[in-house]
């Protein structure tokens, strides 16, 4: 176990709180005008999947569990869960749906990901920062509404909704940031 300050906690970290392991789902630092800055953390208990919210002062010490980040390749999904393979040892790991969370929408066959492993158990998935997806559906732009930089809603090939610039149409391949579903750029391929 390593002690770290609360403000350095990030999504995907594994924390030891009162002898139980938790995976961090979201971590936000708040700096109110008055009072001390705090870190708001939403976590999922590994043993039973219960979601918990904690709030710590940003300078408070929390224990981060030793977790090994291992590179895996996504193979396929079936009734058992999501199957990943370690490209160096060819070992396969099955990850359940609860561990995957909302990130499962971005998985593509053959995609390289990082799984956070603790004692042989997959705790969290770290996707690549950006993925390339196709726009399936988007609203047409009405002339005259482009005076300000406005974005329009679009549905991606994985079913996720994202906001894209007005010049992007259905069928266009775009690069999306996996962390917040935001548009990065038009795909160069």
From Swiss-Prot:
Q: Which GO terms describe its biological process?
A: peptide biosynthetic process
Matches recorded under InterPro entries: Elong-fact-P_C, NA-bd_OB-fold, Rib_uL2_dom2, Transl_elong_fac_P/YeiP, Transl_elong_KOW-like, Transl_elong_P/YeiP_cen, Transl_elongation_fac_P, Translation_prot_SH3-like_sf
Q: Where in the cell is it found?
A: Cytoplasm
Per its UniProt entry, which superkingdom is the organism in?
Answer: Bacteria
Q: Which SUPFAM superfamilies match?
A: Nucleic acid-binding proteins, Translation proteins SH3-like domain
CDD domains linked: S1_EF-P_repeat_1, S1_EF-P_repeat_2
Question: Entry's Gene3D superfamilies?
Answer: 2.30.30.30, Nucleic acid-binding proteins
Per UniProt, the keywords (alphabetical) are: Cytoplasm, Elongation factor, Protein biosynthesis
GO cellular component terms, A-Z: cytoplasm
Signal peptide positions are none
Q: Which GO molecular function annotations are given, in alphabetical order?
A: translation elongation factor activity
Q: Identify the main location.
A: cytoplasm
Q: In which pathway does it act?
A: Protein biosynthesis; polypeptide chain elongation
A Pfam family assignment: EFP
Q: What does this protein do?
A: Involved in peptide bond synthesis. Stimulates efficient translation and peptide-bond synthesis on native or reconstituted 70S ribosomes in vitro. Probably functions indirectly by altering the affinity of the ribosome for aminoacyl-tRNA, thus increasing their reactivity as acceptors for peptidyl transferase.
Q: Which HAMAP family match?
A: EF_P
- UniProt xrefs under NCBIfam families: efp, PRK00529.1
Tell me its family: Belongs to the elongation factor P family.
Question: Can you say what this protein is called?
Answer: Elongation factor P
Q: Which organism is it from?
A: Rhizobium johnstonii (strain DSM 114642 / LMG 32736 / 3841) (Rhizobium leguminosarum bv. viciae)
